Regions:
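Helix-to-loop junction immediately C-terminal to a conserved catalytic motif
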Residues: 26
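Conserved ABC transporter NBD signature motif
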Residues: 34-42, 49-50
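Conserved ABC ATPase "signature" region
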Residues: 74, 78-101
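Conserved ABC ATPase signature
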Residues: 105-109
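Conserved catalytic motifs of ABC-family nucleotide-binding domains
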Residues: 126
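Catalytic Walker B motif of ABC-type/P-loop ATPase nucleotide-binding domains
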Residues: 130-133
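Helical segment within the ABC ATPase nucleotide-binding domain
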Residues: 144-157
Length: 169
């Protein structure tokens, strides 16, 4: 069990099932047994409601190369039915060091910048549970510290954070 407001780490080697568990949480993979409840919501029987309380940062970097960073976040917001949240988007961009990249094309960003956008996408709907699958893979030390500071702040504000990693640092 992961308690509400907890910072929980899934530590294990490659192939241990960390990403598979996250895929089950997000409804991308159907568990072969048991149940997964997120804030009391069954991820199997009520995927939409469960997804509304989850912000998942995937391990793989995926993006629409034809959108800017801001357009990407607005599009993601629309997916959640949120049409006007530019103030929150601006706050996310500032906290992730992306303000100066807001109008840049996604295809023009470095890998580390794209990873920051993945984090921003997971946060646009202000989910109470944040799941990060190897969020600092391939990013520099400065970004890593900046990201942890921001995630730490969100945790102190009451969000539950679940993190997967290979290493203790």
């Amino acid at each position: 069990d992961v308690e509400e407001g907890e910072f929980f780490g899934l530590l294990g080697p490659n192939g241990a099932g960390k990403t598979t568990l996250i895929s089950c949480l997000g409804g991308l993979t159907t568990p072969t047994g048991g149940r997964i409840l997120v804030r009391g919501i069954d991820t199997r029987t009520d995927r939409r409601a469960a997804s509304l309380v989850l912000g998942i940062v995937p391990q793989e970097i995926t993006f629409d190369p034809f959108l800017t960073v801001r357009e990407t976040l607005r599009f993601q917001s629309g997916y959640w039915g949120i049409l006007r949240n530019d103030d929150w988007i601006d706050e996310i961009l500032a906290n992730l060091g992306l303000t100066d990249k807001a109008d840049a094309s996604m295809r023009a960003l470095s890998g580390g910048m794209k990873r920051r956008v993945l984090v921003a996408q997971a946060l646009v709907h202000k989910p109470p549970v944040i799941v990060l699958d190897e969020p600092t893979a391939g990013v520099d030390v400065e970004l890593r510290e900046h990201l942890w500071d921001f995630i730490g702040r969100l945790h102190r504000e009451g969000r539950t954070v679940i993190l997967t990693t290979h290493y203790l640092e």
